[in-house]
């Protein structure tokens, strides 16, 4: 059984690397194999899936889609452009703003919202939009680790360590991931000042985009507020956060479909068409991929592979928590530069628990280090994260082909500075 499980696991990751489209197929097929051969008992399959994480992800996807289509992000960006005429400063602030938005909105959605602003600025000044858009993408990836709802990897970490929304700010009486990420973001400002030192033009003021529907904004703010409030409820059900995200999305969808209001210009006519458009925005493939991975990881745990990998990691680290932590962070940076960080994080979290148990330490430092390396490591290459792929795709549609060298000119220094600061801070607060 162990050989079958190991071969299936390796095959899944090879296919995820080679076949970026239809990524859900390999994990789901492997999960079915695990059940079929008896590695995971059929009667226990549903219990292996973290439904709280899937519900949070699904609900947040839907709410974010409504938020994007309300044109509120464009309005916020327009105000930003009008307030900061200097191109160099504007690009940096736009990247930082993308990071702020990405702390609460999916990274890909953030790029889709703000890339048009960067392109519009570039066209006005007759400069290449490549560097501004890449800066937006890498900044979005950085801040995705800041909060519970910022990125799928954060949701996976929260599910593993049983974290609440506020735990990303203060955990075990110490600063949480949010503050480590902010220090990393501030550390990248000098890097961006140097990268964009030649951009000295100015942008003419533009009319702010009109927002006709403020309900999605209320929904998004309400989701964050409800998650914060739920953090204070003792003994709450395990799927509370999932029900919050799904509940607010469904209520918002019903309101969008049936409440009397002015119809947006880009909106499908009729409640059924409106609901269908919104539901299309939910990435069912990612949900299926995660469900399959949950089953696979449970199977790997049952046959002892997770324990074996944990022992190898501890052995390579020589039993030293600091050396093991260092290997976890920088190996995650390297791996995430070439493979998607979602399946990588999902597979490695149980390994962190096993390695920590072998060394007799709290797994928090290894798990936080994993998130730092896996989330920020995706910024090294154009294929390291979905937001990067989205950004380069947008640029290609505009007629700009982004080479790996062009991307890495921004991605490498940005990543090294951000990871180094996070690496040091996590160890100082959770490892020493």
Feature map (PLM): residue ranges:
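Hydrophobic transmembrane alpha-helices of multi-pass small-molecule transporters
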Residues: 1-67, 173-311, 410-432
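Hydrophobic alpha-helical transmembrane segments
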Residues: 1-6, 40-43, 84, 116-133, ...
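Transmembrane alpha-helix interface/packing and boundary motifs in multi-pass membrane proteins
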Residues: 13-21, 97-106, 137-149, 330-344, ...
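Membrane-embedded alpha-helical segments and adjacent helix-loop junctions characteristic
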Residues: 43-130, 285-359, 364
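Re-entrant/interfacial helical elements at transmembrane boundaries that shape
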Residues: 74-76, 109-120, 133-134, 146-163, ...
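Membrane-core helix-loop-helix motifs of multi-pass transport proteins
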Residues: 121-217, 362, 390-424
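C-terminal transmembrane helix pair
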Residues: 170-180, 292, 323-432
């Amino acid at each position: 059984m162990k050989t079958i499980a190991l071969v299936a696991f390796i095959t899944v990751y090879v296919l995820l690397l080679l076949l970026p489209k239809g990524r859900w197929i390999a994990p789901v097929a492997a999960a079915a194999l695990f059940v079929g051969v008896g590695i995971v008992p059929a009667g226990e399959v549903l219990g292996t899936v973290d439904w709280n994480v899937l519900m949070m992800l699904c609900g947040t996807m839907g709410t974010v889609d409504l938020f994007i289509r309300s044109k509120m992000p464009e309005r916020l960006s327009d105000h930003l452009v009008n307030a900061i005429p200097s191109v160099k400063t504007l690009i940096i602030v736009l990247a930082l703003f993308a990071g702020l938005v990405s702390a609460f909105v999916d990274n890909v959605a953030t790029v889709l919202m703000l890339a048009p602003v960067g392109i519009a600025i570039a066209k006005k000044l007759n400069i290449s939009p490549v560097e501004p858009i890449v800066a937006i993408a890498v900044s979005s990836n950085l801040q995705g680790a800041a909060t519970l709802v910022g990125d799928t990897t954060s949701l996976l970490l929260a599910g593993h360590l049983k974290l609440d929304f506020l735990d990303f700010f203060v955990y075990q009486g110490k600063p949480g991931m949010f503050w480590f990420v902010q220090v990393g973001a501030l550390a990248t400002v000098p890097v961006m000042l140097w990268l964009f030192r030649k951009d000295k033009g100015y942008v003419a003021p533009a009319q702010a985009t009109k927002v006709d529907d403020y309900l999605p904004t209320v929904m998004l703010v309400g989701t964050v507020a409800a998650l914060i409030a739920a953090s204070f409820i003792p003994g709450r059900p395990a799927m509370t956060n999932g029900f919050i995200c799904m509940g607010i999305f469904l209520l918002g969808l019903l309101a969008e479909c049936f409440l009397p209001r002015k119809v947006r210009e880009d909106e499908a006519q009729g409640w059924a068409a409106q609901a269908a458009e919104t539901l299309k925005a939910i990435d069912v493939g990612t949900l299926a991929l995660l469900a399959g991975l949950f089953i696979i990881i449970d199977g790997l745990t049952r046959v002892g592979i997770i324990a074996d990998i944990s022992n190898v990691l501890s052995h390579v680290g020589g039993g030293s928590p600091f050396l093991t932590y260092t290997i976890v962070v920088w190996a995650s940076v390297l791996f995430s530069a070439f493979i998607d960080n979602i399946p990588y994080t999902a597979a490695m979290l149980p390994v962190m628990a096993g390695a920590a148990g072998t060394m007799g330490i709290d797994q928090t430092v290894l798990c936080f280090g994993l998130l730092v390396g896996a989330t920020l490591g995706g910024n090294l290459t154009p294929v390291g994260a979905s937001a990067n792929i989205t950004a380069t795709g947008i640029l290609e549609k505009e007629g700009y082909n982004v080479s790996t060298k062009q991307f890495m000119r921004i991605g490498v220094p940005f990543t090294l500075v951000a990871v180094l600061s996070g690496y040091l801070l996590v160890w100082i607060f959770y490892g020493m």
